[in-house]
A protein has these predicted regions:
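C-terminal terminal-subdomain/extension
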Residues: 62-114
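Compact nucleic-acid interaction/catalytic patches
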Residues: 17-20, 26-60
Length: 114
């Protein structure tokens, strides 16, 4: 089971010119015979203009325990991609129940924006 796991994956920059290994949150378990996983980008650069679907994880918060994240971070639920599980470099940790529930509540917000 991989859902709610924070992993390291090669993630493309906005212009797709280069990739960088970054943390991501697995939003699903493996899908289909090719074991694809839907992931959301995690950044340590917390923008001033957060959007409704962003989830902040503070380093000093109990929500950080077990995630493997070492700095304040933001889960960017509007930056999602489907990848083969084989691209996952390694597991960092797992989000707690609170973050998992927040993710489920906020995941549809980018699609509901009118």
């Amino acid at each position: 089971m991989i859902k709610n796991t924070i992993v390291l994956v090669p993630f493309p920059f906005d212009d797709f010119s280069v990739t960088k290994v970054r943390p991501a949150l697995c939003l699903t378990n493996e899908i289909g015979k090719y074991n694809h996983v839907i992931i959301a980008f995690i950044s340590s650069k917390i923008p001033d203009d957060l959007i409704e679907s962003d989830i902040i994880i503070k380093k000093q918060s109990e929500n950080t325990i077990g995630t493997g994240l070492t700095v304040d971070s933001v889960i960017r639920l509007h930056k999602i991609v489907t990848i083969p599980k084989s691209l996952i470099k390694r597991k960092l940790g797992t989000v707690n129940k609170f973050i998992a529930i927040e993710t489920r509540k906020k995941i549809s917000q980018p699609f509901d924006n009118e």
